[in-house]
């Protein structure tokens, strides 16, 4: 009898770090559901993921719309089967960088609604589905993609840092809540990763990396994060939960 492929959901999986994660999971034998706010399905991305041998679907989803989460989870489960792994990757950057004293409440609310509130309640919907499932014997996990900004502050984008620090705290509490259920929870903290989001500051970080900001002296790539996530999702760390894994080339290591 052919073994069932594990099923993973990657929020924000159509580009950037999310796509790097989706590619690594597809190569690792997962069927995939990727989500995004765009209406049109990323046909080329889905074809690429399916070329690895499994199934791939797209579901439009705005994390800030809490009322739609249950329907999104139900649709994914109906199309692919029981969810084994949730990768919370989707998020937005600071709406406007600048002095904290000029931070607009509506901009703060927007980033918290997506990065923290939306992610928390989408996770709730997925975990409820996982706990209701009775047939899957595959390793199960929730993997939260945060940022070095969860611990290293940037005063000009404090709202973003707060959202990631909150997601880090959520990861710890969720790990404790789910420990006895067999659902592992991990936090992966990317550093300076080459994506569309960082393209506008690439020259700045090229110089900083060359001067040693990142001890490994290179940009991180989306695939670097993806390989870590795939290893965690496969269940090879059976006695670990609540672990924080940096993907930052040493950026977060304290130095004198």
Label for each model-derived stretch:
Residues 97, 212, 230, 241-256:
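Short C-terminal tail/terminal secondary-structure segment
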Residues 179, 184, 240-242:
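Short, small/polar-rich loop/turn modules that mediate ligand/substrate recognition or access, typified
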Residues 14-16:
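Conserved glycine-rich cofactor-binding loop
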Residues 123, 163, 171:
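Active-site helix of classical SDR
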Residues 128, 176-177, 238:
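Alpha-helical segment proximal to the catalytic Tyr-Lys
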Residues 147:
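Residue(s) in the substrate-gating loop at a strand-loop-helix junction
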Residues 97-100, 104-112, 210:
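Substrate-binding pocket helix/loop in short-chain dehydrogenase/reductase
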């Amino acid at each position: 009898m052919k073994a069932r492929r594990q099923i993973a959901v990657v929020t924000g999986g159509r580009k950037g770090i999310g796509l790097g994660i989706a590619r690594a999971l597809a190569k690792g034998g997962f069927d995939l559901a990727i989500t995004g706010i765009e209406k049109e399905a990323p046909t080329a991305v889905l074809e690429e993921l399916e070329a690895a041998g499994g199934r791939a679907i797209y579901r439009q989803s705005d994390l800030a719309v809490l009322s739609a989460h249950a329907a999104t989870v139900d649709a994914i489960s109906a199309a692919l089967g029981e969810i084994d792994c949730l990768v919370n990757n989707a998020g937005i950057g600071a709406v406007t960088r600048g002095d904290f004293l000029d931070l607009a409440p509506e901009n703060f609310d927007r980033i918290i609604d997506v990065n923290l509130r939306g992610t928390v309640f989408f996770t709730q919907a997925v975990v409820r589905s996982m706990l209701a499932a009775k047939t899957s014997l595959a390793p199960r996990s929730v993997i939260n993609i945060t940022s070095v900004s969860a611990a290293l502050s940037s005063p000009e984008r404090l709202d973003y840092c707060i959202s990631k620090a909150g997601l880090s705290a959520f990861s710890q509490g969720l790990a404790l809540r789910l420990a006895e259920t067999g659902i592992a929870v991990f936090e992966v903290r990317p550093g300076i990763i080459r994506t569309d989001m960082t393209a506008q500051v690439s020259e700045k970080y090229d110089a900083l990396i060359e001067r040693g900001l990142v001890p490994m002296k290179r940009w991180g790539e989306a695939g670097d994060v993806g390989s870590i996530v795939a290893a965690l999702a496969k269940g090879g760390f059976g006695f670990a939960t609540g672990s924080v894994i940096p993907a930052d080339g040493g950026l977060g290591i304290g130095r004198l």
